[in-house]
Amino acid sequence: MSDRLTCPHCGHTLDRYDQPRLTVDAVVRNDDGDVLLIKRRNPPLGWALPGGFVDVGETLERAVARELNEETGLSARSVTQFHTYSDPARDPRHHTVSTVFLVDATGEPEANDDAILAGYFPPDALPAPVVFDHARIIADVVHGHVTSGG
């Protein structure tokens, strides 16, 4: 999808394209295999993996470590790329493409920034609602493979 932009000074016209927004999500598991989730402060309201938008000039790995720290206070020791999810319907706000990382982290989770709560939950007993496609991502991680679709 595009629309035309016209410079108000010189009259030059160019196309502006809507593009997907790049995001990252962190899957952090404790020694019992429970998954870290945050309760979101902003819509869509519900529970989600820690994560967010990649800043200009930032690597995916740095972005996931930053978002994890901002939302939970945890520090990433190591990050391993798991899969990239790109279903245009995965985020009700706009088309996002999210790279998911398995993260080994230190510290105790404490809600900050966009999170009002943070805690670990068994993958088979997640709180409701889990927003975006994060329940699917968690299932993919638990089963060690990605289900069909994007």
Task: List where the protein language model places each region.
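Acidic, metal-coordinating catalytic segment for phosphate/diphosphate chemistry
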Residues: 1-25
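Residue-level preference for beta-strand/loop junctions
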Residues: 6, 20, 45, 77, ...
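Conserved hydrophobic "DFG−1" position in protein kinase catalytic cores
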Residues: 28-29, 37, 103, 120
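Conserved Nudix-box catalytic region and its N-terminal flanking loop in Nudix hydrolases
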Residues: 30-71
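A short coil-to-beta-strand element that immediately follows conserved catalytic motifs
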Residues: 74-83
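Active-site-adjacent beta-strand/loop module that shapes the phosphate/pyrophosphate-binding cleft
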Residues: 85-109
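NUDIX/MutT-family hydrolases
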Residues: 100-102, 110-143
